[in-house]
Each structure stands twice: as C-alpha cells, then as structure tokens.
Amino acid sequence: MGRLSKKIRPTESNLSKIPNQSGVYLLYRGKKPPYVGKAGPGRLQKRIRQQLNTRRGITTIRYKPTRSEREAGVWEKKYRNKYNPTQKRI
C-alpha cells in the first residue's frame, strides 16, 4: 500500500474520504508526538471517528490503508517507535 496520507483536519468532509479498510492512523494534538493506532478490516474510518469522540484537541490526522490487520500492526509498531517510543498515548 502507499504512504501515509498528508495531514488532514478532522472535518466531516475529510473523514468521509477515509477508506473503510484496515490501516494505521496518527492523531496529532498541536506539536505533541502523535497518538498511533491501528484499525482492523473495514474499520479505519470508524476507528478514527471513535478516537476523535474520546480524544479532545486533535488538530490533524494522517492515515495509511493496509491490506490486512497484521500489516496495520506492523506499521503501527514502526510509527510508534519512530514518533513516540516510550508510550502510545498523547
């Protein structure tokens, strides 16, 4: 699959364009390291929406669709180690 998306704002218009498949996502709150998460098959858009409902202050989102939940887990680990190696949460 491709690269991470460009940073997008969490607007309804942008969220509706996120595909319904497995993937990894990064949620940014200002300049803090991003929250890194993954979504199983058919759940990328839904999972991002769920996170936005529970996490306040998210300003931008990036995501990467994957072919499987396993692949999403591999990318989640890679991005977590890159952006926030000591913890997962922002």
Locate predicted features.
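Coupling/hinge elements of helicase-like and P-loop NTPase modules
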Residues: 84-90
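Active-site-proximal loop/helix of nucleotide/amide-processing enzymes and allied scaffolds
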Residues: 81
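GIY-YIG nuclease catalytic motif and its immediate N-terminal context
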Residues: 1-53, 59, 66-78
